Amino acid sequence: MIILAATPIGNLGDVSRRLLEALGSVGIIAAEDTRTTIHLLSALGIENRPRLIPLHEHNEDARAGEIVALGREQDVLVLSDAGMPAISDPGFPLVAAAAAAGVTVTVIPGPSAVLTALAVSGLPTDRFTFEGFLPRKGRVAYFTGLAREPRTMVFFESPNRLPAALADLATALGPDRRAVVCRELTKLHEEVRRGTASELAEYFAEGARGEICLVVAGATPATASLPDGIGQVLALVAQGVRLKEASAEVAESTGLSRRDLYEGALAAR
């Protein structure tokens, strides 16, 4: 059996009884970082010393078959460094391979940065989408593509890129789009900062430290205004996108007329 198990995202007290039992008895652990797993076993006072198999983004495709074969004969515990395996962490190829081979996969649920950030954000939680890590480049175009997304959106971002990401968010989705920066969740210096995109961009202009989750409100049903749309087109053009292509992209995401956007942006240049 393959067992995906969630580990703490910052507070060791969040370890579940089921995880403790599994760590104390399992013979094999597939770990994102074996050093992190060894530290976890030591911190929890676990005397069991299972076989540790590295399973990370660079080898998970190649290692999946081996681990599935082991899971056919005995329990294999799968751990990421923090949170739930397969959620923006190694695990998906392994689960897919196990399912295809008819090997049972189960879960020991627990901490999740995505759900923790969503729950504490104060933004609607009935419908949401997790978008993973923001791209390093082309974020204005990326955010513009999400301009009409009605669901609350959750992203991961590095602390070093957070100021630029928030500025791009304000440019693409408007300065008044509601958002929440969740920093160091469940840890000693946890911070949840709510505000508009422009307010958060100003607050974090000098950067931030720690693990970051960014939660962004979905689009309201109201149609975007033409001036806002023209502003989005000009922002894309400033990123190197051709005016015609930028107008088409914003028209697709906002429902505004491509011709009106093109002519308005042309006049504003």
Residues covered by each model-derived region:
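Short active-site oxyanion
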Residues: 23-29, 102-105, 152-153
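Short amphipathic alpha-helix with an adjacent loop that forms part of the alpha/beta core around
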Residues: 64-72, 145, 205
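Class I SAM-dependent methyltransferase SAM-binding "motif I" and its flanking Rossmann-like core
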Residues: 93-149
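Glycine-rich, flexible N-terminal cofactor/catalytic loop recognition
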Residues: 1-57
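A contiguous loop/helix-start segment that scaffolds small-molecule binding in enzyme catalytic cores
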Residues: 75, 152, 156-269
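General beta-strand structural signal in soluble alpha/beta enzymes
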Residues: 31, 80, 107-110, 155, ...
